[in-house]
Amino acid sequence: MAARLCCQLDSARDVLLLRPIGPQSSGPPFPRPAAGSAASSASSPSPSDESDLPLGRLPACFASASGPCCLVFTCADLRTMDSTVNFVSWHAKRQLGMPSKDLWTPYIKDQLLTKWEEGSIDPRLSIFVLGGCRHKCMRLL
């Protein structure tokens, strides 16, 4: 299962908006819950939230407080969608000075999203691809 989503940070509401790319792109955005939310990492959104989701199939962990477990940081330039690169590998080559992997999560949460908000981030990060997940997909009608 894969879905192409365009991510936008809404700092006023402290949410990450995920908008579908493709024929269903006219649907409403799905805001990721704030980090302080009480949802578990494997929980699915409530039935009232499901009607707001523009995609037909999403993993059950999609709306968890920690984000979807299947978020594979694969990115592509909007102009050349067929040439994707693995964001983790791509970024690791630029961050060789990081002392440990324990800094990766705080970096994503603080530094990367701050750069995104300021508009100083590389345009290759405009598209993320949701990849394989151990959770089952939920059908949205």
UniProtKB/Swiss-Prot annotation:
Residues 22-52 are annotated as: Disordered. It holds the Pfam family X. The keyword Transcription applies. A fraction may be phosphorylated in insect cells and HepG2 cells, a human hepatoblastoma cell line. Phosphorylated in vitro by host protein kinase C or mitogen-activated protein kinase. N-acetylated in insect cells. Its main location: host cell. GO terms for cellular component: host cell mitochondrion; host cell nucleus. Multifunctional protein that plays a role in silencing host antiviral defenses and promoting viral transcription. Does not seem to be essential for HBV infection. May be directly involved in development of cirrhosis and liver cancer (hepatocellular carcinoma). Most of cytosolic activities involve modulation of cytosolic calcium. The effect on apoptosis is controversial depending on the cell types in which the studies have been conducted. May induce apoptosis by localizing in mitochondria and causing loss of mitochondrial membrane potential. May form homodimer. May interact with host CEBPA, CFLAR, CREB1, DDB1, E4F1, HBXIP, HSPD1/HSP60, NFKBIA, POLR2E and SMAD4. Interacts with host SMC5-SMC6 complex and induces its degradation. Interacts with host TRPC4AP; leading to prevent ubiquitination of TRPC4AP. Interacts with host PLSCR1; this interaction promotes ubiquitination and degradation of HBx and impairs HBx-mediated cell proliferation. Belongs to the orthohepadnavirus protein X family. This is Protein X. It comes from Woodchuck hepatitis B virus (isolate w64/pWS23) (WHV).
